[in-house]
Amino acid sequence: MSLTLTLTGTGGAQGVPAWGCECAACARARRSPQYRRQPCSGVVKFNDAITLIDAGLHDLADRWSPGSFQQFLLTHYHMDHVQGLFPLRWGVGDPIPVYGPPDEQGCDDLFKHPGLLDFSHTVEPFVVFDLQGLQVTPLPLNHSKLTFGYLLETAHSRVAWLSDTAGLPEKTLKFLRNNQPQVMVMDCSHPPRADAPRNHCDLNTVLALNQVIRSPRVILTHISHQFDAWLMENALPSGFEVGFDGMEIGVA
């Protein structure tokens, strides 16, 4: 069975359009909703199971009815990646497994008052675990809070989800070089910069990383309005694409 990944959000905490900004990218997004960007998140479908990657969307309860998905897979506990959990936890129904890094603090009072969310499913770096037949490997990332990317594998597919990060730790880079993903969804918040940014990648960083990893298809996510404005005037190299909210990626 094929693996399907849908990008439900491709922006950062600021979103696109950014409040009060009149740059070309923000003006375009106000005119045309297809250019809007919500918090970085995704949906993985495999073996009739649905996994939600991160929970930054405000309308999760409207998008998903009880029992319509199996679990959350969190990259980290910054607010723009978990804010949708706060109202959802007070719902009625069966417990919902939440897989994620062993962050002792979490976010605000989520751990103290989890409601129907089951946060006991902490994962460890490079230790493979199974989600309804999907093999998942947590990959340490470079961010201001404990953050994991994930390599998602089936018998025929290999997809990497790498957000939020500034570059990659050496062990993660080596692992991806030796386990080349067919598709790599990669944090790229910034246009090319002379200096390497903190917490998120710029385009120069992503290009350099893929010279090592050599994924044939790189899809950029966590896009800022500044990068969108740059993209309106510049083209990406072959093999690189800009993700958009609602983008569906099938990997046979």
UniProtKB/Swiss-Prot annotation:
Mn(2+) 2 binds at residues 80-81, 164, 222. Changing residue 80 to A: Has 1000-fold lower activity, and has 100-fold lower affinity for manganese. Changing residue 78 to A: Has 250-fold lower activity. GO terms for molecular function: manganese ion binding; phosphoribosyl 1,2-cyclic phosphate phosphodiesterase activity; protein homodimerization activity. Zn(2+) binds at residues 21, 23, 26, 225. It catalyses: alpha-D-ribose 1,2-cyclic phosphate 5-phosphate + H2O = alpha-D-ribose 1,5-bisphosphate + H(+). InterPro entries: Metallo-B-lactamas, PhnP_MBL, Phosphonate_metab_PhnP, RibonucZ/Hydroxyglut_hydro. This is Phosphoribosyl 1,2-cyclic phosphate phosphodiesterase. The lineage of its organism: Bacteria, Pseudomonadati, Pseudomonadota, Gammaproteobacteria, Enterobacterales.
